[in-house]
């Protein structure tokens, strides 16, 4: 396999007295340090052999280091390069040069025949494996008729939170799903559209904060590798969201979910969806808001359901997508305080200009809003227990949000 050599792409070295190496790693092993040692822009996929010998398990860190025992192997795979897989083995003379792919990061989108959400189909976003199987980074339930994602679902690795690789965001892609609709242009020309709809003096949509941004459903920072983060830059993984909310309480919700996964130190399942259509009143007439011509509806609310598969517990965060009103009705009782998200968040979650936000019990939210959950979490046991933040919580998500998203994120 002729992979482009890049000495700083990934450092795998024998841990003989390396400073800062965890004590749990044997001195006769090889280690990958995240994110410092994985710097290749044209990043390969790192695969660990499965029990049956097939290369069907993408590597995921279980902390700042991934260790290989002497004799263990790791495969370097470049989807779409059409080249063989390179197998590398950890040994006592381990001095491995790093590799990067010949082609830039790419992912595929596969439309399945599986119906979801009542009016959508399941789309898998990921890449093919050497085994012939397709590895899904996340899945989206997408309503192709109305060009609207109903929800996305992905796994958040709690042991990898905080060790994601730095990724420079690229352009959002349609992968041909939106047909002749130029969604990128619709976002860029939205102010002109709404000036025509409400008049040139309208105040519903104005920059720098009161405009519609591409609101991620499965957020890029929930993923470790650049290829995974790049995969989130799909329009089917976004819905129009006010920028003030996108970088306000919705970002705070995303931070809370990552904090929760980090404290639990295990995989959690995250389902993120939209609810209703935003209605704005002008001259006593309410109008439903669309980014396009009766397609790409602007949601009234965004919701994020978090599931602990081991304990079968769940919680739902719901945020208003209207920074102009002081109330909203998600049809469920606020249980933020009961779940451990209470007093610290009151100042922020009650601020309508950055997105009114509450926490809900799954059963109440799903039943009253007639939400059809994906089959992976459509288990009645989840409706019985509220997922709470442990008392030894990391309060990073409670602090004022200072991390800025990319422009138009």
From Swiss-Prot:
Catalytic positions are 216 (proton acceptor)
Which residues are listed as membrane-spanning? none
Q: What is known about this protein's pH dependence?
A: Optimum pH is 5.0-8.0.
Which EC number(s) does UniProt give?
Answer: 3.1.-.-
Per the record, its GO cellular-component terms are:
extracellular region; mitochondrial inner membrane; nucleus
Q: What miscellaneous comment appears in this entry? A: Passive immunization of mice with antibodies against the protein reduces feeding success of sand flies when fed on immunized mice. Enhances dermonecrotic lesions caused by venom serine protease from Crotalus oreganus helleri (hemorrhagic factor). Immunization against the protein protects mice against L.major infection; protective immunity is abrogated in B-cell-deficient mice indicating that antibodies against the proteins play a significant role for disease protection.
Q: Which UniProt keywords apply?
A: Blood coagulation cascade inhibiting toxin, Endonuclease, Glycoprotein, Hemostasis impairing toxin, Hydrolase, Metal-binding, Nuclease, Secreted, Signal, Toxin
Q: Which residues bind Mg(2+)?
A: 246
**Name listed for the protein in its UniProt record:** Salivary endonuclease
């Amino acid at each position: 396999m002729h992979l482009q050599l890049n000495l700083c792409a990934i450092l795998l070295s024998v841990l003989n007295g390396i400073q800062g190496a965890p004590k749990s790693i044997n001195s006769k092993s090889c280690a990958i340090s995240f994110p410092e040692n994985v710097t290749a822009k044209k990043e390969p996929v790192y695969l660990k052999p499965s029990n049956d010998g097939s290369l069907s398990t993408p590597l995921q860190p279980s902390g700042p280091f991934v260790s290989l025992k002497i004799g263990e192997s790791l495969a370097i795979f470049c989807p779409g390069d059409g080249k063989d897989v390179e197998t590398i083995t950890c040994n006592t003379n381990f001095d491995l040069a790093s590799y990067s792919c010949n082609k830039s990061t790419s992912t595929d989108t596969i439309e399945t025949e599986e119906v979801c959400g009542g009016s959508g189909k399941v789309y898998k976003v990921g890449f093919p494996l050497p085994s012939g199987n397709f590895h899904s980074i996340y899945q989206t339930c997408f309503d192709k008729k109305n060009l609207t994602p109903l929800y996305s679902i992905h796994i958040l690795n709690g042991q990898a939170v905080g060790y994601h690789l730095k990724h420079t965001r690229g352009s959002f892609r349609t992968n041909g799903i939106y047909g002749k609709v130029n969604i990128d242009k619709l976002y860029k020309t939205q102010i002109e559209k709404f000036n025509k709809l409400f008049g040139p003096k309208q105040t519903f949509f104005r920059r720098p904060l009161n405009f519609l941004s591409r609101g991620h459903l499965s957020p890029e920072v929930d993923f470790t590798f650049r290829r995974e983060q790049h995969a989130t830059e799909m329009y089917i993984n976004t819905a129009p969201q006010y920028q003030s909310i996108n970088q306000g309480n919705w970002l705070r919700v995303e931070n809370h979910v990552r904090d929760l996964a980090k404290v639990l130190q295990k995989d959690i399942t995250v389902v993120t969806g939209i609810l209703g259509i935003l209605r704005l009143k002008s001259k006593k007439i309410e109008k439903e808001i669309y980014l396009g011509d009766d397609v790409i509806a602007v949601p009234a609310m965004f919701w994020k359901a978090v599931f602990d598969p081991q304990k079968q517990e769940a919680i739902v965060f719901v945020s208003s997508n209207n920074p102009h009103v002081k109330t909203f009705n998600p049809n469920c009782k606020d249980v933020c305080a009961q779940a451990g998200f209470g007093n610290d968040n009151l100042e922020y979650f009650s601020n309508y200009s950055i997105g009114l936000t509450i926490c809900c019990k799954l059963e109440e939210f799903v039943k009253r809003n007639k939400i059809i959950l994906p089959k992976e979490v459509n288990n009645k046991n989840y409706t019985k227990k509220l997922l709470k933040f442990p008392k030894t919580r990391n309060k990073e998500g409670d602090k004022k949000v200072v991390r800025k998203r990319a422009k138009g994120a």
